Amino acid sequence: MQERVLVGLSLGVDSLATALLLKAEPFSVVGVYFHLHQEAKDLEKVRKICKDNNIEFHYVNLQEEFYKDVIIPFADFYLKGLTPNICSYCNAEFKIEKLLQYAEKFSCNYIATGHYARKNDSLIGIAKDSWKDQSFMLYRLSEKQREKLLLPLGQKMKDEVKDFVRQCGYEEIANKKESFGLCFTNGKHYSEFLLEKYPELKKLENGKVFNKNNQEIGTHKGYPFYTIGQYKGLNCEGKQYINKIIAEENAIFVGEKSECYFSTLRLNSLVFSQNIENIELNTQYLTKIRGKDEGSFATLREISSNHSIIEFSQRVFAPMQGQDVVVYDENNFILFGGRIESFS
């Protein structure tokens, strides 16, 4: 009897390739379309693809839960003066967790997604296609989530995936322009999205901008709309780069671009993929501070269950409080990750 795998489906090339690859292995593939936000404009097309390929299909409306469990926390991060990587949060706390819940409901042995990341037992690592690598946004997954997760695209290049989907007869989907940015903002900048949801943020206009001598040199539109390293959108003379944000005072501090480089990061909210006892202090590890970052080596100075301190040999540009950092072992599998608490 074939094992059943639940695949989260959209009309994207990656999720479609995932379902078709697993069906060819063979698994008994079950497709689920999670309606998370806005209109479910691709629903009927996804349903037809499943019917044409003899894939069991389910539709689940999760709009209310997604708003409560993802969009509100997303806004809360910014209101605290933090810069979230909401995709890693959403994957662990919502999407993968919901897939597991519905896998049990639909009697599936595994779940699968179209993320580009390698898998070895319960470890997740950098994809073969390093440019498309999405391991960064999966670092917060629990061991239970990782054990049940299949990642069939981890050993494939993006062009291979597109060619496979074309060969399966879905030229239009293979040629579809890739979407970037947040899935729930409908192409809008996050600041515009926040203002729509929280119009009271207009009250933060005319916040003060200070230089390194604490002199007031201009104004800004409100601290939630800015991040470290940003220079656009400030009402002050010259090209000034943000190097500090004090949310409680609605205050922003600026200076030269060189003042936005830092070498030491303190992390909190740690999630471990490997045993902490096997992680060595004063050792250099490949470290990513952004999803599309190729990574650079940082030395681990402190580690506990609650916090970590890492030091880069070359300073990194614009680390931000709340931002994720992921640390990899010598084989490019995730050791642990966390959120930036402070930097210096």
Regions found by a protein language model. Give the residues of each.
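ATP-dependent adenylation/nucleotidyltransferase module used to activate substrates
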Residues: 1-139, 159-160, 166, 242, ...
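AMP-forming adenylation/ATP pyrophosphatase catalytic core
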Residues: 2, 112-118, 124-344
